[in-house]
Amino acid sequence: MNLVMFGPPGSGKGTQSSRICSYVSASVVDCGKLLRVAALTMRQSEDLKAGKLLPDELVIGVVREKLRELIKVGDNFILDGFPRSVVQCHALFEMSSELEFEISCLVKFEVSEREIFARLLDRLVCSACGALHDVVLGRCVSCGSVECERRSDDLKVEIIKKRLMLYGAVERDIVNLFRSRSIKVLSIDAGRSVDEVAADLRTQLLMFI
């Protein structure tokens, strides 16, 4: 099963991806993390920190190589943070033909803007493994490290607004493109607790297996 996790920043895509991979036997492809460790220019790094979208060709290239690696060894994948533009969406469909894989489902996370602001202004990123978690935890739930800090693109309200605006500008077009390919779009109420969302998602996804 190959999944695409789609939703605004702070909607819980990464958190749910890490849970899903255990029962659908798939590797999580965190596009944001891939780009943060890629050999970016100084300008590109600053744009990423400012919440701006990087050039489509750069993002597509990074994702294509990662998917190529996974497909080569027979792994399924969960895409988190890609596609984020119509161009990237078309590129993903081209990759599916080129690398011979099928996209099982687009999981669309729906959550209010108010909740998104609350989450993004109250989360940390682990300096050791890159996992995201709530600030109240104080310790990384993935590796146990206490070396955590706020992600640079979560620091300012203006940056969060920009990220939400970028998502809103392409949300409908991307969803419609998946539907035009007869790919199921699964809408999830992501405004609930992590466990509630996980349970609902598990129930619905297991219907595919």
Swiss-Prot record:
Mind telling me which PROSITE patterns this protein's record contains?
ADENYLATE_KINASE
- Segments carrying the region annotation (NMP) are 30-54
Picking any one GO molecular function of the record gives: metal ion binding
Q: What's one GO BP annotation on this UniProt entry? A: AMP salvage
Q: Which Pfam families does the record match to this protein?
A: ADK (PF00406)
> What does the record give as EC number?
2.7.4.3
What's the entry's take on its domains?
Consists of three domains, a large central CORE domain and two small peripheral domains, NMPbind and LID, which undergo movements during catalysis. The LID domain closes over the site of phosphoryl transfer upon ATP binding. Assembling and dissambling the active center during each catalytic cycle provides an effective means to prevent ATP hydrolysis. Some bacteria have evolved a zinc-coordinating structure that stabilizes the LID domain.
UniProt similarity note: Belongs to the adenylate kinase family.
> What is the name listed in the Swiss-Prot or TrEMBL entry for this protein?
Adenylate kinase
Q: Which organism does this record belong to?
A: Neorickettsia sennetsu (strain ATCC VR-367 / Miyayama)
